[in-house]
Amino acid sequence: MTSAEQSIADYIRLLDPAERPNPYPLFARLRERGPFRIGTAPVVIVPGHADCAAVLRDPRVSVDRSLGKLQLSSMLIYDSSKTTSEQAKPSFLFLDPPDHTRLRRLVSKAFTPRVVQQLEPRITELVDDILDKHSTAGTFDAVTEFAYPLPVTVICELLGVPLEDEAQLSHWSSLLSRTLDPTSRHAAEHQVDPAELQRAGTELSGYFERLTERRRATPGPDLLSQLLTAEDAGDTLTHDELISTCALLLVAGHETTVNLIANATLALLRRPAELAALRANPERAQGVVEETLRFDPPVQLIPRIAADDLTVGELAVHRGDLVVMLIAAAQRDPAAFPDPDRFDPSRDNRHLAFGLGAHFCLGAPLARLEARVALTRFSQRVEAPRLPTDPPVYREHVNLRGPAHLPIEYAAIRPR
């Protein structure tokens, strides 16, 4: 087998559920190969840190999936009750400047670090409420009973979604997050009936349509009401843009934050000294979050479309090619991170987990805050936590990485 054939074989192995507990040896081999093409397919794999950073900043590389030679959806939600021309426009996740710049400018004021920081008391209260449900010694699932409830509650409260609707929105979010994984069409156990995805998109779109109308009639202090009146130099969000933005905030902001919290919790439980250090000094939480984003990122790869011909490393990339940046490989690149396979919350971190450039993750301040608060309160309140089994069973996603379940045994939950 040639080196190129071995790289393709290793990339395909990433789809194997048996590799989910530890895909990083595969990523290391792919990184050693450098940028490569998947046979004759219009797909280029970029595994190194410097190359990924360069591609993320390159204006010739687009998020507009309609420019690609492969058929990839640019819709987070597809409402089957509407014709193609009536569909809500793609969210700014799949738009390039100037459309992306305009939409992001209208939405970004709600997600600045200063604004997000004001949510810390409420997020702390939510985390404590979750932990209070486990007041006696025993076990709990740190995914379904800790990491999962927090982000959906936060985003639903931000949008003004009634408490009784949170479970339904969580279900839609879980289904529709699969559209964020470009490998899902190839992973058999990950495939979902397209009709089920369309039904979820139709129901979610209809839900936000009805909620928007209620907020137009009776505005509140929530983010949806703010987005309805958001204005910049006389510009406002159209109705379709508003629906797409709400869907993006829910789908993209929920699953990724769940995985960030779960991956960080697992990293700490595997390293009792780090957990003890965090308990003694809560200021270390931010370093734990940033190192988790590098060491075991919740988003493993970032897809883009080449809008023009370019060169990555020594590899020619053609217009219309799908360019897949292996962020999980790049963030263990020894050329960028000394001793990259060591979990070190004190390191100087230049990770790419939130992207770079114009498409840097809008929700990064909120995800960081939620994870920091969750880990701090976990370390302070959960007495003698341990993993009864390791490794855990991982979720179906190749791109969105996190355990499906994370059982934890503990001695007690300390009072608030």
Region annotations inferred by a language model:
Residues 1-416:
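Cytochrome P450
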